[in-house]
């Protein structure tokens, strides 16, 4: 101890050493113990005092300490508020109980009473169990009124008492028409991929990187995109506007309503004013698996080249976002513990990863574009590894094969499936699929949703996808839910959108017929209670089924969906209600049906056929009983690449392109594939296809070939009709403008020159012994030989053109060449006249024809037929921008104007997958034609007319070969509400 040590003695040379310890003076033992206790007490006292002082000082320091001078206290407090938001998982915004729509403007539109409507509420009748409801019990249309106030549906009743209707209410009489909520399209690119497509306007994909969670579709949304209004005319009131699928993570999507500017009831013209939920309760993100990212980004120096690279990019992105989430959580935890004044840095924020971090927090509904089993499984694995839910898989062609994988998705809620009804075969990922997927998914307890992927499909007709789903077996209520309540719920808006119910947004559609029927169109659309069309065109539908009951139970789906058709030579049919054939045009009396006997591939009896049935049954012939069968000629698929291509996006599976070379389709046939089986299944027993020019499948260059779709190879008996070469095809649409040095004038000028040169040398054949020519000269001579046949009226010149200007130029060239030919014929010698005959002029056909109605009278005067491919163009390209959208925007469509002018019209294919829908196209023309067409005339649009326009003579339809002798007719099961033919 210090007090026991005296000072050192001064140094002196004479000083003696200290005495030994044994001789030193000792204190008494008691004294030493007392000193020790004293010192211990003093040390403890000092320690306690020090502790108290330190504690007081720390308390004082904490209360008075300020953040470092380089940090803003206001921002730190904002950061703390952000912490609170980061840890809140959104709840679906409430609907019922609101006093007004969140989008409603004070002083907005007047109340509206919609009277006398056949209402589909989107819910089964009260008291229906969930099990019964899913099975289709408790659903019905019922007659009633809907009151709309302050942007909301405020009351739905069988008959609204006058006392409950505001005095200033607008009264709209629905006249017994069907009323539903607005259609919700959960996959659209409207506004970011404006039409017509121009490079300067396209903002679909931010392809600068493969991982772009920071991209936002709203920043590219163009409110003046014309298709926003066209889509609305199909009853679509809300759309999820997604970035494209070029990137594995494409960015944020936004849910909009199709009301634009003051005319539509909005306060301003802006993307922000179109948001369906101004509070942005939920956020949405687009991700994409598979082929697209590999194709767009993959190379030797950039990922992904394979799906392995894609998974790494996904996982690395999720890891980085997870790191941001952890850093934020750590900051928030510490700030909550010690106070923001103790923080020496702001909350970690990173704009690049903020949205993806929010997805990992469950604040973003992830929408993943994934087609295949391996892509679906990989994405589900990612969701479990990084613990985030997936709200929906889009496209998902193979999802019906793997419900177990889907049910393993993290979070306990399996994703919904946003699908097409029958759009497939366009790339390898879409090669495995079935139009029955909607039914199969529903039966597996999953949620099918039909979408447009606009402009891939015209979202104006997205409800037709649901109708096709119903046709392929999805229950009626589930089919209608697939474009109303199901997408609304999946988007987190199930308390505001998708139902006709008090408290829901007043997004309402009144239809001219059953919305799941062919050709259904709105007569009026309301968004937030504001009527969207001042003077809507209402179609006259003499064939529509009138409803007399106040409660209508929806039709059942077809009882059997046959995956593969059966070819038989002998069969008996019961339950046929309509026969539409050249020699037979018979309809059964109301409530009755017809029997049809077919023996040896030919119809032997129509009617009661008692004797024929007895003899045939005794001989073991099978009997097929139908509910509402129609017997008619089969269909012809024209305009696509049927028989020349199997997977559109995979060049190895097709004949290839012919931008420079004139070829014959008969030399490139590839039969026996899925497309042709699908065609045959749909009653399309014949197809006429030309070699592809370039670009899409609806460009043509060379001679077309006629094939029977059930043939396995071109050597099968009767596999080819039309003598091997049907028509001579050239493409003169926008695809001829492929380079800076290519022009319309050059393309049309080249055709004129070829025709004139063929006519000048029309009578001369190659002389025996003449000098051999090279391959290029041979090809030119072959092309010239076919053009001579065109000039001699032996073959049709089929031109693929959409623009009215292009069609006008083609008609001028035809007139010019015809006059030259007439003059030359007058000067020819008798020998030449006998050899080639006298031409009556070029027989021309137009394929495509999106703007043909603008020159309808000229087409009729020139006797030029038009094969509309498709029936109703969407105006996707500049040369088709004047296409007519139809009711309620325009009085009639292209086909109506052409028929009125006397033009012979057929319906063809824009893409091969449409081959299943030719009957629907004919039905649409029939239902929406205002009585212009009989049932048989409508069917001729996809049969006889096509053959006549392309010059296939009647005797060529049924060649003498075995396959042809069977006759081309088909028996289809038709649901009354689905097709009025």
UniProtKB/Swiss-Prot annotation:
Biological processes, Gene Ontology terms: N-acetylglucosamine catabolic process
Cofactor: Fe(2+); Mn(2+); Zn(2+)
Record field: compositional bias (Low complexity): 823-835
One GO CC annotation: membrane
Compartments in which it is found: Membrane
Residues holding Zn(2+): 187, 189
Keyword annotations of the record: Glycoprotein, Hydrolase, Iron, Manganese, Membrane, Metal-binding, Transmembrane, Transmembrane helix, Zinc
Stretches with biased composition (Pro residues): 7-21
Residue numbers binding Fe(2+): 187, 189
Membrane topology note: Single-pass membrane protein
The enzyme's E.C. designation: 3.5.4.-
Pfam families given in the database record: Amidohydro_1
Ranges that cross the membrane: 40-57
Disordered: region residues: 1-36, 86-107, 819-838
Coiled-coil regions listed in the entry: none
Compositionally biased tracts (Basic residues): 24-36
Root EC class: hydrolase
Predominant place of localization: membrane
Known function: Amidohydrolase; part of the gene cluster that mediates the biosynthesis of the tetramic acids Sch210971 and Sch210972, potential anti-HIV fungal natural product that contain a decalin core. The PKS module of tasS together with the enoylreductase tasC catalyze the formation of the polyketide unit which is then conjugated to 4-hydroxyl-4-methyl glutamate (HMG) by the condensation domain of the tasS NRPS module.
Similarity field: Belongs to the metallo-dependent hydrolases superfamily.
Protein name: Amidohydrolase tasK
Encoding gene (name): tasK
